[in-house]
Amino acid sequence: MKNKNRLNTIKLLSISLLIAVTTACSNTVELSKALPNDPDFAPIMPEEEEERIVPSGSLFKPHYVNNIYSDSKAHRVGDIISVILSEKTQAKKNAKTELKKANETNLDAVTGLGGVPVSINGESLQFGISQDSNFKGDAKADQGNSLSGNISVHVLRVLPNGNLMIRGEKWLTLNNGDEYIRLTGVIRSKDINSNNTILSNKVANARIQYAGTGSFADSNEQGWLVKFFNSTWWPF
């Protein structure tokens, strides 16, 4: 019987360890997917406009001429916009719980026939029960993030309402690895400044990813066994 229980315990630990290894490996694979020259982040080529026939025979084509008084804001597929990264978040949370409960129950002396209290060795029969429980919990969390810089992105698509879908990435090759920034989202044309820049807090549905690859990034990554002990799979 003891050998059977021991075998079941070993099986349970083996399954838990296998799940932890699988989870750790899946996280590693997810991080390694970010590689340079990703086709999903390839440069967007401008759409080719159909050549319009000018019936007058003139060589002047107003459709391809930019007004000298017009601004240089991006508004077509393939145009480039500079996004100024100015992200800062701060979150604080405090939780405090204190519970107290006290119960007390007394039973009067047991009486017999004629209302005479029943006694044993001269002591009357009576009962008393009391219970006292206390619980106190205190939790505090404080987290902050900031990201500054700039990245140039392409206009991926022009929506029917005039909004622009943007996408782009920037890779920095360092001695011990690569650092990259990726950004996707939707912006309004009127939020673009006259110098063709826009703040990152004006980007709707923004997905900003800043990470790195290489030995420097690996040194800051927890091992799979450490992840297991810090995960919810660890029962203690």
From Swiss-Prot:
A lipid is attached at C25 (N-palmitoyl cysteine). InterPro entries: Flag_Lring. Assembles around the rod to form the L-ring and probably protects the motor/basal body from shearing forces during rotation. GO terms for molecular function: cytoskeletal motor activity. The keyword DNA damage does not apply. Keywords: Bacterial flagellum, Cell outer membrane, Lipoprotein, Membrane, Palmitate, Signal. A lipid is attached at C25 (S-diacylglycerol cysteine). This is Flagellar L-ring protein. GO terms for cellular component: bacterial-type flagellum basal body, distal rod, L ring; cell outer membrane. Belongs to the FlgH family. The lineage of its organism: Bacteria, Pseudomonadati, Pseudomonadota, Gammaproteobacteria, Alteromonadales. It is found in: Cell outer membrane; Bacterial flagellum basal body. Pfam families: FlgH. PROSITE patterns: PROKAR_LIPOPROTEIN (PS51257). The basal body constitutes a major portion of the flagellar organelle and consists of four rings (L,P,S, and M) mounted on a central rod. It is a lipid-anchor. It comes from Colwellia psychrerythraea (strain 34H / ATCC BAA-681). Residues 1-24 form the signal peptide. GO terms for biological process: bacterial-type flagellum-dependent cell motility.
